[in-house]
Amino acid sequence: AAGRTNSEMSYNILREAIVQKLDIEKAIFENIARVAGNATTARKLGGLGAWLKTNTSFNTAGSGANPTGNIGGATPRTNGTQRALTQALFDDVMQKTWVSGGKPDAVYLSAFQMNKALSFSGNNNQRQTGAVGTVNNNMAIYMTPWGQVTWQPCRENRSRDLYIIEHDKLAIATLRPMKNEALAKTGDNEHRQIVSEQTLQVRSEASLGGVFDLTTS
């Protein structure tokens, strides 16, 4: 293609590596149970939704429930009837997380929930005059008595879920580093595969929080 300095193969390898990283990010934010795997079943990481149960808010009146059992990530949470995100719901989970010893520093949420958060009271800088001809409608940092968090809108985050995160208490563990491998040729056609395996490592579930069962429209 015009403007490419490398081969078409190199371009597609790079593109697929980027897509693979997005797939991993999406899996992290999913409500999926982990699978240990065996000779016939692929291993699967447990998403954040299947880990969090100490500091959560969900709709108990609408059949919502935390994951069960004592093994983190082993069972998915039960989705409940959805309700709108409110400041009270958010602040309640922030308080629970602080009481449990957490020091959250970031909030991951969808674009829809970010717009809901912009209406939180106390956001005095929500609308302020920027350069001539512009209006700033943004809230990057939210301060509470239980800590200061940075808002991180995330395309891969399930819109019905909001996660309150302490980054030091999460990690992406690499089981197999990303590797570009050549496969057998078919005539003049060259084939390659990009293989990697990562999993979500939760170092302290009690340092994290989540607001679940949120409306998405």
Task: Locate each region found by the language model.
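Core alpha/beta structural scaffold of self-assembling particle/tube/pore-forming proteins
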Residues: 1-217
